[in-house]
Amino acid sequence: IARKESNTKVLSNIDAVNQARSMVEAVHLIQLGARASMVCQLTGLNKNIVSGLYQPLTGMPSPSGQVPFTDTWYLKNNRRLLHANVVWRLFQQLERMERTVANVLVHVYKAYVEIVDTPLLNLTRASFVPRLVRIKAWYEQACDHCGMTYIGPLEKSGSICPACTEYFNYRCRSCGAAIEYRPTGRRKMLCTDCYERQKRSKRRLAHGGIDG
């Protein structure tokens, strides 16, 4: 009887530790912007407990909105795809350690926010990246230019990673020189020197080959 009571006490202590760990993970997820449904799914806590944490932690109820179910948002902008690849690399590193799913996501997102200047993915978008690989919407493939592996939809003709795409987006189409980044407006295709050279060439043609 004493041994049975001892085992029951040990199991009770383990349950208490697991509950405390889940609560800590829930707090971290909420502070990073997770919705109540995600917190419940990742920690196993019931909805009433999770919902009760939002007001004291954030001063407001759980954010509304739906979990993404396609990759459309990521593919609308190359930089989003680039950031998704950063998140994927972090997941690969941290999933090798003996951590809970919630703990991995918390550490991945904190590392991602530290690495990039301006995070483009919120916690929900970041958590969906490994799922895109699991459901075979995205695949690992090698870039034809740099040879590095990246994730994304399978390309039918050639393969170029988001980093190389970003690189070539800001290189002169004529000479390959770097072009300064423009956050707004149309992207420049030529560097200043090539642009001026092209203008002079057009003027010569307009005047019958005579500069002036």
How would you label these PLM feature ranges?
Residues 1-28, 32, 37-212:
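Long, charge-rich, low-complexity intrinsically disordered regions
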